[in-house]
Amino acid sequence: MRKLISLILVIIFPYISLGLSARIAFSEKFIEWEYSRKNFPEDRWGMEKEERLKLAKLGLKAVISDKGMEEFKKARLKNGKRAFTDREVKHMEDVKRFLSFFFPSVYVLSIIWIAGVFLLRSFDVLIWSGIFNSLLLLFLGILTFTNYEKAFELFHNVVFDPYSWKFRYSDTLIRIYPMKFWYDGTLFVAILSFLFGILVLFTGILGKKFLKGKGA
């Protein structure tokens, strides 16, 4: 039973590290940082950065709160036109539904993982969790960044209705969240998740050495 619990804890750790990293990325600070970068693409139809940034933050609020979604639906461009089409609103509602399951599941599994580690009192779980996390991320990273647009499309087709998330370049969602935004966001999540794994790995190694030294 102890080995089975250890195996389960090791297997769920990458889900936890990726989920927590994604939650950190889903923040206004990340959006502000991304928009402040010199190589962030300008809007080809001339929308000012301030307006794009405001709408991008509103999109974030929309997928994490009911109030934000209501504001998102009512949003207007500076010219008075409706900012988002019904199709764009529908997709963001789909994203909100997905995140309402995904993030809570990450929190629950995080608690289970921490409780399991304390229950087993084994630094080996930390070590193997870190190793498995690093190897899996390396594998997924190679697959993802070899052809990012294809990986992006595959992910969306699996998680959402394949016909619900594709938009025209002139649609506001594409203008405020260009592919560069998602590429950088994915890279940020991957790196942060990798660092989480390394931290857990070295915590396990140092803890094991400490116990050995104490026993000696």
From Swiss-Prot:
Highest taxon listed in the record's lineage: Bacteria
Keywords: Cell membrane, Membrane, Transmembrane, Transmembrane helix
Entry's Gene Ontology cellular component terms: plasma membrane
Locations listed in the record: Cell membrane
One Pfam family from the record: Lit
Bilayer-crossing regions: 5-27, 98-120, 125-147, 185-207
InterPro entries xrefs: Lit
Chief location bin: membrane
Membrane protein topology class: Multi-pass membrane protein
NCBIfam families attached to this UniProt entry: integ_TIGR01906
Record's protein name: Uncharacterized protein aq_2036
